[in-house]
């Protein structure tokens, strides 16, 4: 009896294990894992925020309030960068704005944790001083020449232009405010949502060089890679070393992703920050980064040239690179683009295994 009972228990255990394996297999069949990769400042985290807005319930009032200290840091840090840049370029501010400049330097000299706790909200008086600085001719000139002295976030003008609203006592961050915030991504962050009966896992990993060693831990069971490139940063240098061109770094990283790490995985290329690129190309020729480029300061020619540079990297003939021009802060644009991405992924899955019949 003891032997029979033991045998039956063993069979039950095996059955439970098999059922568990089958359940997990079916779960994975109904799950799409998108790995969001790209160099730093390419807009990956903004894409993740858009998925929460579009495919989840968006941000609650409490969640919006949590962004206020981040917005404060962005405003203060960005203005400090401009003031320091003025010093490097030998510029001066209007004497009437001296107190405002001192205020910025004092606040940003505090440790980040103290500033976040004590200055989670800027008051109206501080807002007026920041607004005065933003309209200062010297600060405006430094803004135009920012690429000469720093990697100033491209969202800086957005926050300065909105300073009155953001320092109101009743201020609650909007979707656009949240989308424009900049916090360096560290570690791995997941955004989960459903479209129909299919579960999506969007995995965002930090893009700075120090964060890329964490990418390997996310490579299992990837359905497709979404690779983000900032079109507008073709003339800027990396935050990490201030000597490597950002576009050339993106090309190098894309080569590793396409030809080494994900040879058999669909890759969707987001050529991001198209709005900023459209304006910049009018003033900064793409040939400064790519001397062989002869298309002049034409948006369509320049964006197509960059797209083709990435396409040419692919060494696997049977693998297509799907590309989209994107503006990560434009919710309507990302909604339309992601519909196309969804169709690409579903088609690939059907062709490969008939999972979503």
Curated annotation (Swiss-Prot):
Ranges for region G1 motif: 33-46
One Gene Ontology term, aspect cellular component: plasma membrane
CDD domains referenced in this protein's UniProt entry, alphabetically: G-alpha
Residues anchoring lipid (S-palmitoyl cysteine): 4
Region of interest (G3 motif), residue spans: 200-209
Signal peptide: none
Residues with PTM Phosphoserine: 113
Residue positions binding GTP: 41-46, 154, 179, 185, 207, 272-273, 275, 328
Lipid-binding residues (covalent, N-myristoyl glycine): 2
GO MF annotation, one: G protein-coupled receptor binding
Annotated region described as G4 motif, given as residue ranges: 268-275
UniProt keyword Nucleotide-binding, yes or no: yes
Residues that, per the record, bind Mg(2+): 45, 185
Ranges of residues in domain G-alpha: 30-356
Biological process terms in GO annotation: actin filament polymerization; adenylate cyclase-activating G protein-coupled receptor signaling pathway; adenylate cyclase-modulating G protein-coupled receptor signaling pathway; aggregation involved in sorocarp development; chemotaxis; phagocytosis; regulation of DNA-templated transcription; regulation of protein export from nucleus
Annotated segments matching region G5 motif: 326-331
Modified how: Ser-113 is transiently phosphorylated following stimulation with extracellular cAMP.
InterPro entries cross-referenced by the UniProt entry: Fungi_Gprotein_alpha, Gprotein_alpha_su, GproteinA_insert, P-loop_NTPase
Role: Guanine nucleotide-binding proteins (G proteins) are involved as modulators or transducers in various transmembrane signaling systems. G alpha-2 is required for the early aggregation process and most of the known cAMP receptor-mediated responses. Interacts with downstream effector gflB, a Rap guanine nucleotide exchange factor, to regulate the balance between Ras and Rap signaling at the leading edge of chemotaxing cells.
PANTHER family assigned to the protein according to its UniProt record, in alphabetical order: GTP-BINDING PROTEIN ALPHA SUBUNIT, GUANINE NUCLEOTIDE-BINDING PROTEIN ALPHA-2 SUBUNIT
Subunit structure: G proteins are composed of 3 units; alpha, beta and gamma. The alpha chain contains the guanine nucleotide binding site. Interacts with the RAP guanine nucleotide exchange factor glfB.
Protein family: Belongs to the G-alpha family.
Protein name per the record: Guanine nucleotide-binding protein alpha-2 subunit
Encoding gene, per UniProt annotation: gpaB
